[in-house]
From Swiss-Prot:
<feature type="glycosylation site" description="N-linked (GlcNAc...) asparagine">
    <location>
        <position position="195"/>
    </location>
</feature>
<dbReference type="InterPro" id="IPR017949">
    <property type="entry name" value="Thaumatin_CS"/>
</dbReference>
<dbReference type="InterPro" id="IPR037176">
    <property type="entry name" value="Osmotin/thaumatin-like_sf"/>
</dbReference>
<keyword id="KW-0732">Signal</keyword>
<protein>
    <recommendedName>
        <fullName>Pathogenesis-related thaumatin-like protein 3.2</fullName>
    </recommendedName>
</protein>
<comment type="similarity">
    <text>Belongs to the thaumatin family.</text>
</comment>
<keyword id="KW-0325">Glycoprotein</keyword>
<feature type="disulfide bond">
    <location>
        <begin position="36"/>
        <end position="232"/>
    </location>
</feature>
<keyword id="KW-0568">Pathogenesis-related protein</keyword>
<feature type="disulfide bond">
    <location>
        <begin position="183"/>
        <end position="191"/>
    </location>
</feature>
<feature type="disulfide bond">
    <location>
        <begin position="77"/>
        <end position="87"/>
    </location>
</feature>
<keyword id="KW-1015">Disulfide bond</keyword>
<keyword id="KW-0020">Allergen</keyword>
<feature type="disulfide bond">
    <location>
        <begin position="145"/>
        <end position="221"/>
    </location>
</feature>
<dbReference type="InterPro" id="IPR001938">
    <property type="entry name" value="Thaumatin"/>
</dbReference>
<dbReference type="GO" id="GO:0006952">
    <property type="term" value="P:defense response"/>
</dbReference>
<feature type="signal peptide">
    <location>
        <begin position="1"/>
        <end position="22"/>
    </location>
</feature>
Amino acid sequence: MARAMHTVWIALVPTLFVFLQGINVKAATFDITNQCPYTVWAAASPGGGRQLAKGQTWTIQVPAGTTGGRVWARTGCSFDRSGRGTCQTGDCNGMLSCQGYGQVPATLAEYALNQYMNLDFYDISLVDGFNVPISMTPTSTNPNCKGRITCLSDINSKCPSELKVNGGCKSACARYNTAQYCCTGASANNCGPTNYSKFFKGQCPQAYSYAKDDATSTFTCPSGTNYKVVFCG
């Protein structure tokens, strides 16, 4: 029995260690600011959504351990008093307060908090296309933190005609939905850049231009860092 209990204890140590680490990590604060010369409807998953006129800021708290988090701007929206409506880009099921991810195209600020080696991972992604310029800035002064990343190019004005939609620029994956462009199926483990992804990378070198663009597009900060996301700035 003693040996059995010892075996169980050893098996639980890694889980307990991760749990105890998580206790000391607070929720991250995200300040989301609109510096565009037009109104946007900010969206966050988790977090919901809110209308932001130029200069306004929306602050949300995101629990430690959150994965698959993202922030984006919606444009061309109209909502009724109940919070139902539509957006030209970034729409999330017709809801002002988003309960999930939005529709393409949308420029994304993505993150995963308190992950491997007690790090946050963050990036800007054009895998879902582009609608609004964006920057993401950790507030930490830790030298191990990458710092501000941006995608401030006016991609909409330069978008290839076959990817252009009202208010945005689709990615090739969103436009064609093929294994080659989406890095799925036969291309899942052997997926390189295409002329389309090279276009996006040329406009925003720090951003994901396609699904496997990890090497130059993923950044880290120590867990417990807060972040600022700014549209058009």
